[in-house]
Design a protein with these regions (language model features):
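Low-complexity, intrinsically disordered segments with a bias for serine/threonine
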Residues: 10, 22-23
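Bacterial N-terminal signal peptides
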Residues: 8-16
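Extended soluble regions of mature proteins
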Residues: 23-284
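N-terminal compositionally biased, intrinsically disordered segments and leader/signal-like regions
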Residues: 5, 19, 32-33
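Bacterial N-terminal signal peptides that target proteins for export
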Residues: 1-9
């Protein structure tokens, strides 16, 4: 499983409230950055002794300075990707936009009140709208796999604190058989933490979210605060390793226009089958 991270899960799961929720509703914009390093990048950045060890010490990986990583990311053929996403939140609506290359050529709008997901491509003047029924149809086309036995996850406090982007954060470590994560959480974003259970419930009801391990990771972290910085080291047996850094760079509370969450009326609406063909690399 590719570890998507509790920050991403938190944002997608945790920013909407039903009309009966008691927590203060968040409205505003959250800006995030995700940096992913592959084997080649790690070999360029780590000391030779660390690379020659039978198993790379994740602490050496987590200690790599961000400025060195970003400097290397600016060079060609470096095995590093830097993606940024902007999450705009209003009530039960969520708009996701950003720079993630070919993976997201436009933006997405999730309306949990209406129970719809829209993937919008302005360059082509089109969008795809999916409902819970569409997600169920898509999932029925994928063969079910046997559930894997996984170790019980626990969030272990590391007793470390530091300021990250103006927020006071504490560190917690979570380890599975395939990855280890150190997540820095803050208690200063309580309205985001209070909301995540409702959004998770809405996503699961729509059939959009079934990564139970990511859900469990965020639930463990949310007991202590909202994740601001997450460092994850993944190992793939003989197939190498990967290092992911996901960071909340800015949280801005402000009123947002309803137009931001509406698809232009002249855009063409495509079918689910058109979406599946696009995912398979076929043009319309």
């Amino acid at each position: 499983m590719k570890h998507t991270g509790s920050i991403a899960a938190a944002i997608v799961m945790g920013l909407g409230l039903s009309s009966g929720a008691v927590a203060q509703e968040f409205e505003g914009v959250i800006t995030t950055r995700q940096v992913t390093l592959g084997d080649r990048a790690l070999s360029m950045l780590l000391d030779p002794d660390a690379l020659e060890a039978e198993r790379i010490d994740y602490r050496a990986v987590f200690a790599l300075p961000m400025d060195r990583i970003l400097e290397l990311a600016g060079q060609s053929n470096n095995d590093i990707s830097v993606d940024s996403l902007v999450y705009s939140v209003k009530g039960t609506q969520l708009r996701v936009s950003g720079d993630v290359g070919d993976e997201m050529p436009g933006y997405a709008i999730l309306d949990f009140g209406a129970g719809t997901f829209q993937l919008v491509q302005p360059a082509k003047g089109m969008y795809i709208e999916l409902t819970r029924e569409d997600f169920e149809t898509y999932k029925s086309m994928i063969p079910e796999s046997e559930p894997e036995a996984k170790r019980s996850l626990q969030a272990r406090p590391l007793g470390q604190t530091k300021q990250i982007n103006g927020l006071e954060c504490s560190a917690y470590e979570i380890e599975s058989d395939e990855w280890i994560t150190v997540t820095w959480v803050t208690t200063e974003l309580g309205d985001l933490v209070d909301a995540f259970v409702e959004f998770e419930s809405r996503m699961k009801a729509m059939g959009m979210y079934d990564e139970e391990e990511d859900s469990e990771v965020f639930s463990l972290v949310a007991e202590h605060g909202f994740p601001v910085l997450e460092q994850t080291f993944l190992t793939f047996g003989d197939y190498g390793a990967e290092y992911e850094i996901t960071e909340i760079q800015n949280v801005e509370r402000r009123s947002l226009s309803a137009d931001l969450f509406a698809v232009p009326s002249d855009y063409e609406k495509l079918s689910v089958m058109e979406m599946l063909r696009m995912m398979g690399g076929q043009e319309k």
